[in-house]
Amino acid sequence: MSKSFGNVVDPHEVIDTFGADPFRYFLFREVPFGLDGDFSRHALIKRFNTDLANDLGNLLSRTLSMIEKYFEGIVPDPSLQADDAETPLPGALQLKHQAESISSAFDLSLEKLSFGHAIDTVWDTINNANKFIEDEAPWNLYKTNNMQKLSRVLYTLAETLRIIAVYLFPFMPSTAEKMWKQLNLAHDIAGVTLQIESQWGGLRPGTKICKGPALFPRIETDKTL
């Protein structure tokens, strides 16, 4: 980049337009630490709309909206059992295992200063959580009054979001704090430790969620390019 060519990126202008967290996210994902990288508003907007709005934002919004709709905003108890034998729920167990297993690849990536790879491990979990919603179709569970399975599905999603927020905090602190508050977790996310908060079960059933506005409203390309 060169001032004489007029292609210098003003970070303050980018932050004013897109926000600090999306800009940080883009740089971590697109630019290897310590190396040169390319920046374009088009690429940032694509990351914003695809990764942040569609993947993460929709996962939080859909999960909390269903908890509001089906459980009056109260995090359901996944241990509720039907009178008959519990039906296995492989998808929930798989997502739980993946959320619990983020730490190994995440820690190794940080040791190597591979911040993009660290975020990749978190995004793999986000993508699988979205797939879990489509596979289990909670709306159909509600229609058939399968509240036991619905409880387990929605608790699994909400607890996965809690763990995701913990891992995102070093990279996107404002976003992680918003997720934390919408899950209505009492303690400050800035004071948590990965070793403790990455363990499954930190979100207590019976917690009243506080769903807020969309984390990342989609950007209309023609208004920003």
Each predicted region: which residue ranges?
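Short hydrophobic "helix-edge" motifs at membrane interfaces and signal-peptide entry regions
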Residues: 8-10, 102-104, 162-164
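Short, charged/polar, low-complexity loop and linker segments
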Residues: 36-41, 100-108
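Basic, alpha-helical terminal appendages of large translation-related enzymes
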Residues: 37, 108, 112-114, 123-225
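Short, hydrophobic, well-ordered secondary-structure elements
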Residues: 53, 57-67, 119, 123-126, ...
